Every structure is written in C-alpha cells, then in structure tokens.
Amino acid sequence: MRMRKKPNLVPRMERCAATLITDPEALRGRWLEQFPGHQALQLELGCGKGRFTADTAAQNPDIFLAAIEKVPDAMVVGMERVTERGLENVRFLDRDAANLLDMFAPGEVSRIYIN
C-alpha cells in the first residue's frame, strides 16, 4: 500500500527537526561520541511510522537508535511519536538503507532491526 502525500509535511517535519539527522555521513565512526551516555548504537531499517522505533527507544534508554526511512510521509509520523514521548535516544535519517556503509563504520552498529 502506498503512503498518501501529506500536504503539511514540511511544517510537521520542522516541528520535529531535533529528531532528524540531515548529514549522517559526517557522523560515520563517531555516532556514540556525538551522542554520549549510550552503551550501544542500534539501527532500524525501514522505520515507517515509528511505532517500533519509539517503543524500543523507550524500553532501552541506554542505547542510541538510528532509524532509517526513505519515505518522509511515513517518517514524520515516527518523528512526531518520538517528540511527543520526549525520547532523546533516537534520531531519524531520511536515507536509503543501500547507503549504510557511507553512514556507519564497520563494527559501529551493535544490532540491526529490519521492519
């Protein structure tokens, strides 16, 4: 099923901008250094509307979760969920998972979730 385009996508994303990493390639090899206080970096591929993302981040405050979604109309719902719940240990990446090696160094990610 195709996601409907959201006419108010841009203002919704702007309200949740703190949860979005716009240049993840610049963090390659430095994720936990950039976001200290977390024991591990975990990755979710295809986070969609972010239900799993928000629940996982809430249940595991000691991990940092990077959630990748290439469809902004779905990702914005997840960004809103995380913002509403006040979760600080998750960030969203508006990227295609095919480019993972550009964003993460070998051995940097401890667990990958595929949804």
Language model features with spans:
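S-adenosyl-L-methionine
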Residues: 1-43, 51-58
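SAM cofactor-binding core of SAM-dependent methyltransferases
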Residues: 40-98, 102
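A short acidic, Gly/Pro-enriched loop at the edge of an enzyme's catalytic core
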Residues: 102-111
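A short beta-strand submotif of the Rossmann-like class I SAM-dependent methyltransferase core
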Residues: 114-115
